[in-house]
Amino acid sequence: MASDLEQLCSYVNEKIENIKKILSLRKLGQDPTLKTTLSKIGDEIITVNELLNQFELEIQYQEQTNSSLKELCKSLEEEFKDVEHLKEHIPSHLPQVTVTQSSTHKPDLDPKESVKAEEPVLPKKPPKEQRVIKEMHFITTDEFSGVPAYMKSRLTYCQINDVIKEINKAVVSKYKIIHQPKASMSSVKRNLYQRFINEETKDTKGRHFIVEADIKEFTTLKVDKKFHVIMNILRHCQRLSEVRGGGLTRYVIT
């Protein structure tokens, strides 16, 4: 019983001490000479909080980079093993490469062979002209520094260029389908091709563009608030322009 009373008294005394501390701190807050100091402390706390958020974003980016590098190393190791295996198991029946030395005396040619040698060589057909797919250029550090702070918020230079990389992936995937012969298309690609054509307007003729559906189709990016903030930054840096119409926003590569 005495032990319980002692614990209760100790608990009550602790609460009283806490109340006294709170009251003393409250009085400090009302002191005009300390208000400026407390305000500065509050500002510093906000600044530290923002720095912690930036550190958190940077740590996430470094973790993603580390994961990608591990996957790359694993892939390279597997390819190296395959090369070593091929090197050790070259089939013996393959012909050996022989180096022939040029002779100063040309052997006599058979008349029939000389006639063949004199026949004109038909010109080769010129290769088909490859269509160039326009991709977005990465932003530079100077351009990133020139973006207003309110626009880029806590985004980093690397995060923006990572999005550009994904946008280029979507652009290349889309226009490879458009340039592909229709006869060789699967039903899925035919449907995509038809959508691409339907999204064209007179303002996008001859220009490369994508819509949000292409981002979802060809990349792992999330079309969220962060994505739209980055698109605004890219428009500010003159990497793209927008053409609206028919309920769609077309992001045109500039």
UniProtKB/Swiss-Prot annotation:
Region named Disordered = 97-127
Q: Where is it predominantly found?
A: cytoplasm
One GO cellular component term, please give it. Answer: centriolar satellite
At the top level, the lineage of the source is Eukaryota
Q: Where in the cell is the protein located?
A: Cytoplasm, Cytoskeleton, Spindle; Chromosome, Centromere, Kinetochore; Cytoplasm, Cytoskeleton, Microtubule organizing center, Centrosome
- State the Gene3D superfamilies in the record: 6.10.250.1370, Ska1 microtubule binding domain-like
Under the heading InterPro entries, the entry gives: SKA1 (IPR009829), SKA1_MBD_sf (IPR042031)
Q: Which Pfam families does the protein's record reference?
A: SKA1
The molecular function GO annotations come to: microtubule binding
The motif SXLP motif: which residues? Answer: 92-95
Q: Where is the composition biased (Basic and acidic residues)?
A: 105-127
Q: Where is this region: Flexiple loop that anchors MAPRE1?
A: 91-131
Q: Where is this region: Binds microtubules and protein phosphatase PP1 subunit PPP1CA?
A: 131-254
Phosphothreonine (modified residue): where?
Answer: T156
The Gene Ontology biological process terms listed for this entry are: attachment of mitotic spindle microtubules to kinetochore; cell division; chromosome segregation; establishment of meiotic spindle orientation; metaphase chromosome alignment; mitotic cell cycle; mitotic metaphase chromosome alignment; mitotic sister chromatid segregation
**Keyword terms:** Cell cycle, Cell division, Centromere, Chromosome, Coiled coil, Cytoplasm, Cytoskeleton, Kinetochore, Microtubule, Mitosis, Phosphoprotein
Q: Which residues carry this modification: Phosphoserine?
A: S241
- The parts of the chain that form a coiled coil are 58-90
Q: Where are the transmembrane segments?
A: none
Its annotated function is as follows: Component of the SKA complex, a microtubule plus end-binding complex of the outer kinetochore that stabilizes spindle microtubule-kinetochore attachments, promotes alignment of chromosomes at the mitotic spindle equator (chromosome congression) and assists suppression of the spindle assembly checkpoint. Kinetochores, consisting of a centromere-associated inner segment and a microtubule-contacting outer segment, play a crucial role in chromosome segregation by mediating the physical connection between centromeric DNA and spindle microtubules.
> Its family?
Belongs to the SKA1 family.
Complex formation: Component of the SKA complex, composed of SKA1, SKA2 and SKA3. The SKA complex is a homodimer organized around a central W-shaped coiled-coil structure, formed by the interacting domains of SKA1, SKA2, and SKA3, each end of the 'W' is extended further by the C-terminal microtubule-binding domains of SKA1 and SKA3; the complex forms extended structures on microtubules. Interacts (via SXLP motif) with MAPRE1 (via C-terminus); the interaction is direct and stabilizes the kinetochore-microtubule attachment of the SKA1 complex.
Identify this protein by name.
SKA complex subunit 1
Q: Which organism is it from?
A: Rattus norvegicus
